[in-house]
A protein has these predicted regions:
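TPR repeat positional signature
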Residues: 26, 33, 82, 87-89
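Short terminal interaction segments
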Residues: 1-16, 99, 103-142
Length: 142
């Protein structure tokens, strides 16, 4: 009973969070996982590397599933290509245990995370001024 109530409460909290904050949180966690996987690779910690790489792939997959190609247009198409490439490189990283591949993905994702943080700031300002949300927000469906 308690677990069900807790889940309902968590779901209600998630619905109350603006979707852009969810995207920013996912990107932040993604970067943390990539960094942890790279560090684990350098330290020879195979299990940690695998767990963090798997988490990074799961996050990227969730971001890809959230793309709305109807509303997002070219932005959604480009993000999808980037996500596919990132998953491919992380898979290679896991097989080869080459930290340079993880760094490559980090360098690919970091500007996106920065852009989403900026969009979050713009969204806060826009909502305060009753202005329409940025186009990139329409590329994601949550």
């Amino acid at each position: 009973m308690y677990a069900r109530q807790s889940r309902v409460y968590q779901d209600a909290q998630l619905e109350a969070v603006p979707r852009i904050r969810v995207v920013v949180a996912l990107y932040d966690r993604l970067l943390t996982s990539i960094d942890a996987a790279e560090q684990a690779s350098r330290a020879g910690q195979i299990e940690v590397r695998y767990a963090e790489t798997s988490r990074a792939v799961e996050i990227i997959s969730a971001l890809a599933r959230a793309l709305d190609f109807n509303s997002g247009g070219e932005i959604a198409v480009h993000l999808d290509r980037i996500y596919r490439f990132a998953i491919q490189r992380l898979t290679e990283f896991e097989v080869r245990n080459d930290p340079a591949l993880a760094q490559q993905v980090r360098h690919l994702i970091d500007p996106l995370a920065t852009a989403w943080r900026q969009l979050e700031q713009e969204s806060v300002q826009a909502s305060a001024n009753n202005v329409e949300a940025p186009a990139a927000l329409r590329a994601m469906r949550f």
